[in-house]
């Protein structure tokens, strides 16, 4: 007599697959909004950290340069913050004789996390949220920051509100 073995079936039924898909859909609908909120909070935190760093370095520049702020064109201000400077604010490569101050920021200005720009718009006047234009360009560089050579104030060149409520340009 022949021995008949039952074939075992492997795999999942259609119902089992559908149940798993429904469960994954429910999980995704509850988890994805939390990731979106985390992204907004991370952008705000990055913006606050960048502004804090730049403000403290501008304060250090002012202290080391006898009360004078970075000044001149956008290129001059960026160079005064990212290169070595002399007491008069002239910029040169770090290590150049006679240029004992700075660099205050390593490399280049940080990118604004909301518009991606790392250029700086320099105003010889006080600045406010009315100066914000997130589409502003300086040649091929997007403007991420607005700086006043009068007050030393620096703000984000971003419209809208932070996740915590205040206007981005007022952080």
Name the predicted role of every residue range.
Residues 1-12:
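N-terminal leader/signal peptides at the extreme start of proteins
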Residues 24-41, 62:
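C-terminal juxtamembrane segment of a hydrophobic transmembrane alpha-helix
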Residues 40-51, 67-68:
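Membrane-proximal amphipathic alpha-helices
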Residues 58-106:
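Short, glycine/small-hydrophobic-rich surface segments
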Residues 89, 109-113, 159-163:
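Acidic glycine-/aspartate-rich tracts in secreted/extracellular proteins
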Residues 124-171:
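Short, surface-exposed interaction loops/tails
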């Amino acid at each position: 007599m022949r021995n008949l073995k039952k074939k075992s079936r492997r795999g999942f039924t259609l119902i089992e697959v559908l149940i798993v898909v429904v469960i994954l859909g429910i999980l995704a609908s509850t988890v994805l909004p939390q990731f979106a909120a985390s992204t907004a909070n991370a952008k705000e935190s990055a913006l606050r950290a960048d502004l804090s760093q730049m403000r403290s370095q501008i304060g250090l520049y002012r202290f080391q340069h006898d009360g004078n702020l970075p000044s001149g064109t956008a290129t001059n201000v960026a160079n005064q913050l990212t290169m070595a400077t002399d007491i008069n604010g002239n910029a040169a490569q770090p290590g150049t004789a006679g240029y004992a101050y700075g660099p205050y920021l390593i490399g280049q200005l940080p990118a604004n996390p909301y518009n991606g720009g790392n250029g700086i718009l320099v105003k010889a006047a006080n600045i406010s949220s009315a100066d914000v234009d997130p589409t502003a360009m300086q040649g091929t560089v997007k403007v991420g920051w607005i700086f006043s050579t009068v007050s030393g104030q620096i703000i984000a060149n971003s419209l809208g509100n932070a996740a915590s409520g205040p206007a981005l340009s007022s952080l």
